[in-house]
Amino acid sequence: MISVGEIMERANHSLVRMRREGEDLTLEEKAEICSELELQQKYVDIASNIIGDLSSLPIAGKIAGTIAAAAMTATHVASGRLDIEQTLLGCSDLPFDQIKEVLENRFNEIDRKLDSHSAALEEITKLVEKSISVVEKTRKQMNKRFDEVMKSIQDAKVSPIISKINNFARYFDTEKERIRGLKLNDYILKLEEPNGILLHFKESRTPTDDSLQAPLFSIIEEGYAVPKSIDDELAFKVLYALLYGTQTYVSVMFFLLEQYSFLANHYYEKGYLEKYDEYFNSLNNVFLDFKSSLVGTGTSNNEGLLDRVLQVLMTVKNSEFLGLEKNGVDEMLNEKINLFNKIKEEIEGKQKMTLSETPENFAQISFDKDITTPIGDWRDGREVRYAVQYASETLFSKISHWSDPVSVREKACPTLRMPVDQTRRNVLVFRKFDSSKPQLVGEITPYLSNFIDIDRDLYNAASNPDSAVGFKEFTKLNYDGANIRATFDHGRTVFHAAAKSGNDKIMFGLTFLAKSTELNQPDKKGYTPIHVAADSGNAGIVNLLIQRGVSINSKTYHFLQTPLHLAAQRGFVTTFQRLMESPEININERDKDGFTPLHYAIRGGERILEAFLNQISIDVNAKSNTGLTPFHLAIIKNDWPVASTLLGSKKVDINAVDENNITALHYAAILGYLETTKQLINLKEINANVVSSPGLLSALHYAILYKHDDVASFLMRSSNVNVNLKALGGITPLHLAVIQGRKQILSLMFDIGVNIEQKTDEKYTPLHLAAMSKYPELIQILLDQGSNFEAKTNSGATPLHLATFKGKSQAALILLNNEVNWRDTDENGQMPIHGAAMTGLLDVAQAIISIDATVVDIEDKNSDTPLNLAAQNSHIDVIKYFIDQGADINTRNKKGLAPLLAFSKKGNLDMVKYLFDKNANVYIADNDGMNFFYYAVQNGHLNIVKYAMSEKDKFEWSNTDNNRRDECPNEECAISHFAVCDAVQFDRIEIVKYFVGTLGNFAICGPLHQAARYGHLDIVKYLVEEEFLSVDGSKTDTPLCYASENGHFTVVQYLVSNGAKVNHDCGNGMTAIDKAITKNHLQVVQFLAANGVDFRRKNSRGTTPFLTAVAENALHIAEYLIREKRQDININEQNVDKDTALHLAVYYKNLQMIKLLIKYGIDVTIRNAYDKTALDIAIDAKFSNIVEYLKTKSGKFRREYKSSYGERSLLQTNQISNFIDRKNIEHDHPLFINADNESSELFSKTASNIDVIGTLLLIDVLIRYFSKQGYISKESDSASDGITQAAALSITEKFEDVLNSLHNESAKEQVDLAEVHGKVYAALKSGRNSQIHQILCSSLNSISTLKPEDMEKLESVIMNSHSSVSLPEVTDSANEAYGETLHLFGESCLHSDGILTKKLM
C-alpha cells in the first residue's frame, strides 16, 4: 500500500487547488483533480473491464449499471488503494459515481451495438471494428506521451503545427467519448446535427487551416520529422507527433465509417430505406475520399499520407548515424512501419465500400398465382410497391427507387419479372404496403428473371400470433410452393418464426418436412428454434423439438446461453420442466461469464427458483467467473423472497465469497439495503466480519465508505460485528467515518465507547484525518471527546501540520484556537508555519506569527525558511507579509535557492521588481553559481533581462563572477560572459539578439562558436547573415570544429556551404573531421569527406583521420573510409609509434575492427617502433580470442613462427635455404624469401599469393607419400627443430593458398590452420611423414559447405600446380613420380575418401 507520506508529497500541488471549506466540487472537478494521481483513468479502466467480466449479468432493470459499479468499486477498494489517498483529495465518493456513469454509457453503447446489421453492412462493420482496434490500441498508448512531447516543444516554427495536431486529437477524443454513452435517440440526434461532428471530421482531410491533414503534410514537406543526428531531439519529437497525428487521421476515417454504418443500419431496421440510401452513400463517399488521401490514386504525383509517412520512417530507419539497435528507436520504427503497412494493405484491398451503381427498377408485376385475398398483408384496396438492391459477394448497392404502386384486387403473391443482371449479381427485393415498414421479401440469384413474392408471406404466417389464421395461411402458401428454408430477419427461418409464435401445428408439420440439421439451424446470433421457443415460453414447441432430437444444450454465439438459461431468466416453469425431461440436459451449464441457469433464475422469480432447487443435480453455490453465486445475485437484486427461497434449500453458503472475498453481506452494505442487511445479520450462520482481499474491508467499512448511515448504524449495534476491525493499512470504521464526515456514525461510536485514539499503521489518528479532510467541523467534535492534538504520525506530523500542509485553513485555525503546539517539527524539521507558507494560508501564517514572531525565519532540515517556501510556490500575499514581518529576504536553502531566484526562474517580473525594491541581493547565487540573471536568460525571460540591464545602479553585468569560475578556469569571467553563453546554449534567440545585436557584444563568449557547439542553426544563421560574423570565427578552433564534434549535421552543412574551411586546425593538429570521428558522427564525416577533407593530414600524434577512426572504435566510419575513400587513405599507414590500424585495434581489444581490417587486406606483419606485430601485442596482453583469430585468419604462419623465435628466425638463419639445398632444389633464395613483401617485383599482384617454396614442399610431401619414400632422409634425422618448423609452416601455408583459391569464406572458417600446422609439424618431427597426406585430406573432408564446383576447382588447382613451378634439376624419375603423385592425390584424397563423391550427390 502506498504510504501516506508519499501520497502527501504527490498530492500537494493538487490539494492547493482544492476549494476552501464550504464549497462542494462537482464530479467533473473532482475527476480532474483526482486524475493527477491517475485515479480517474483507473476508474475508467475498471469500468471498461466490467463490460467483459459481467456482460451477461442476469440482472435487469435500471439498477444494472449501479450494481455492476458497486461490484467493481468494491474490487477497487479491495485493492488497498482507498483510504488516505482519496481522503486527501476528497475523492472518496468518486469511484462509485464515476464508474456508475461510465458503465451506464458503456451499457448504452453495447445496447446500440447489439442491434443487428443488415447484410449490406455486416462486412463493413467487421472491417471497421477490426481496424479501429488495431489503430486505437497503439494510439492510446501514444496519447499520454504526446502530452509530454507537446509541453517540451518550444520551437517557434514547429510548435504551432504540433499544437494543431494536438488540438484536433483532443477534440476528436472528447467528442467521441461524449457521444459514446448517449442513449439511442440522443445518439441519433447528435450524429445528425447540421454542421455537426460528422461534417467537421469529414473535413479533417481537407487542406483547411483547422483540419488535421494540413499540419501533417506541413511536417512532411518541411522535413521537420527527419532527424539530422542522434541528438536531434526536436525532430524525434516531431516524428512522434507525425505518427500520432497520422494514427488519429486513420482513426477519424474509421470513426466516420462506423457512424455512417450505424446510421444506415438504424434506418434499415426502421424501414426508412431513403435514409438508409443516404447514409449508405455517405459511407462509400467517406471511404473513397479518405482512401484517396491515405493511399493516393496510384499515380506518381499523387502519393497518399501513409506513403509519405512510410517514406519518412524509412528515411529515419536508414540513417546510419542513429545507432538504432542501441537506443530502442529501431523497435518503434519497425512497429510503426508494420502498422502503417498493415493499414495501407487493408485500405488498398478494399476497392470500395459499396457497389457504385444504383439499380433501375424494371420490375413488371403480374398476379399469376391462384392465391386469393385476404391473406397475410394482402388486403384488397392496399397498394404495394417494390424496390431492389444489388448484392455481389460482400458489396451492396444503394436501394433503388420504389416502383409505381399496384392496387391489390382479389389476388396475392405476384410474380416479378426483371431483366437478368449482366454482371451476374444477386438482387434483393423489398416490399412495402402503403406507408408501412418495408420488408425484405427475397433474393433473385443470377440468370433468373422471375421472382414469386411468396416466401416472406410464409414466414409472416408462421409468425402470426393467431395460430388458427397463421396455420391456415401457412398451409395455403406452402401448398402453392413457398420455400420453408428461406431466411429473413437476422437469418431466421419459418422454424424460428413458428417457435416464437408458438404455433405448434405449423411446427408439427415442419418437423416432418425438415431434416434434423434444419431443426438445429441457428440464426445470426446463434439462436436455434429451441432457443427461441424457450425464450418465448412455448413449452409445447420445446417438447416437440426435444422429441425430434434437437440439441438441447446448444449455445448462442455471443453469451453462450443454452435454452435453459433463457427459460430460467423468463421464469417459464413449464418450459423448464419440459427441458428437464431431456436426459441430455445439463442443469449447471455455464454461459460466457460462468453464470449457470440457476443464476438466471434469480431474475425469473421464486417459482422457477423452486423448480430448480427441486432438482437433485443442482449446484446451489455455483460460482461465475468472478465468483458470484446465485445468493450474491439475489442480494444484489435486493430480492429477499428469492434469497429466502434459496435459503430454504438448506444448501446455500451464505458466507460464500467472490474473487475479491466479498460476501453477500458486503454487497448489501455497499448498496445500502438496510432490510436485507437485517435479514442477513439475523441468520445464525452469518459471519459479519469477513474482510475483502486484499483490502481487508468488512461490511461495516463498506457501509460507512458509501455513506449508508442507517446500514452502518445497524451493523455497529449488532453484537456479532467487530467495530474495531482493521482494514489494510490499519484503517478502522472510525477512520472511515471521519474520512467521510459521518457525524451520526461518530456520535454512535462515541456512545458505544469506541477508542478515539485508534491509529493506522502510519499512526494517523481520527484527528489527523479530520485535520486534512473537507469536514473541519469534526475537529472540534473530536477535541471535545478528548482527542490528543499533539499525536504524531510516523513522519512526525501533528494534526496542525497536516492541516497546514494540506491547505486546510479552517481546520488549522480551529486547532490554533485550541492552543495546540505550533512549534512542533516533523521528520523534515518543518513546523506548521512552513506548511502555511507552502500552501498559501495567509490567515494561518498571520495567526501563528501573531503568537510567535520568531518562527518567521525558522529553517527546516533543508534550510528552507517560510519565506523561501512561499516563494517557491508563488504565494505573493504570504511573501509580502513575511517580508513586512522582517523575514530575511536573502534566505537560501541547502541548494542555494533564494526568493529572487525562484521568481526570476518563473518569469515573474513584478516580483523581481518588488524584491529589487526591497534591496534583495541581486548577485545571490545557488550552489551551481546561478544568479537571478542567469535564470532569466536560461528560461527565456527577456523582460527580466532588459529590466536588470536598465538597473545600472543595482546590477552590473560586467562584474566578475567567481561563482562559476570552474566554467572559466583560465581567466576571470564577467556575468556578461556566462549570460551570453547561457543564452546561446539554451537557444534563447531573442535574448541572443538583444545581447549581440542591440548591445553589440559580438566577442563575448564567442556566440557563433557556442551556437555551433549546441547545434542551434537559427542562431548560427542570425549571427552569420545579420551580424556578419565570420564562419571560421576568430579563435583557433572554428565553429565548424564544434559543430562537427557534437554531430550537428545541419549546422555543419550550413557552415561549409558558407565557406567554412574544412581543414582548419581545431587544436593539436586535429581538423573538423577528426572531431566528428572522435564522437562517431558518420553522417558528418561523410559530408566533410565529400567537401575537400585532407585525409593524409596528421595530428600532433601523427594520426590521420583513418587511424583516429580505428583508435576511437568508430567501426562504421572506419569501414566507410576503407570502402569509399580507399584512394585517399593507406590502410597500412603508421602513427609516430609506427603503430598501424591493426595495432590500435588490438590495443583496444576491438575484435570487430580487427576482422574489418583483415577483411580489407591490412598487412599483419608490420612491426611498430617496439618491434611488435599486432599478434605479438595480443599474445603479450593475453587477449586469447584475438590471438586465436589472428592465428587462424591471418594465414601468415611463417610470420607467426618468426615472431615466436625472435632472432632465430628461419629467414635470418637461412635454415629454409639449407633445408631446400638438401633437396637439390636450385633457386634464387632472396627472391623467394621476398616474395611475400609488398616491395617485391618478382610477382605480379595476381601471382603474389603463390609461395613457390611452399608449393615445392607440398609436392615433395605428396611424391614421397605415393612413392613410399621417407620425407626426411637419414642424413636429415639430425635436422634442427627450426628446419622441421619451417617445413610444416610452408606446407600449411601452401595448403591455405589452395583453400584461398576457392573464394569460399565458409570453407576457410571450417579449417583450423593452426591445428593443421601442429599436426603436420608433429608428423614430420616424429618421422610419420605418411600421415601428412591423411592430415590434409582429413581437413578437406571436414568442410561441410564445399560445393561440387568447389571440389572440381580444387582438383584443378592441384593438378595444375606442376606448370606453376620450375624444377630444373629434378631427375626424370622424380618428375615422373611428381606427375603420378598429382594423379594419385586426386584419386585418393578427392575421390577415394569420398569427398568429391559426397559433394556431387
Curated annotation (Swiss-Prot):
UniProt subunit comment: Homotetramer in membranes.
Signal peptide range: 1-20
Name of the protein in its database record: Alpha-latrotoxin-Lt1a
Region (4C4.1 epitope): 1026-1032
Biotechnology: Is an essentiel tool for stimulating exocytosis and study its mechanisms. Its mutant LTXN4C, which is unable to insert into membranes and form pores, plays a key role in understanding the dual mode of action of the wild-type toxin.
Cleaved propeptide residues: 1200-1401
SMART domains: ANK
Post-translational modification (record): Processed by furin-like proteases at both the N- and C-termini.
InterPro entries, sorted: Ankyrin_rpt, Ankyrin_rpt-contain_sf
Entry keyword annotation includes Transmembrane: yes
Cellular component GO terms, alphabetical: extracellular region; host cell presynaptic membrane; membrane; other organism cell membrane
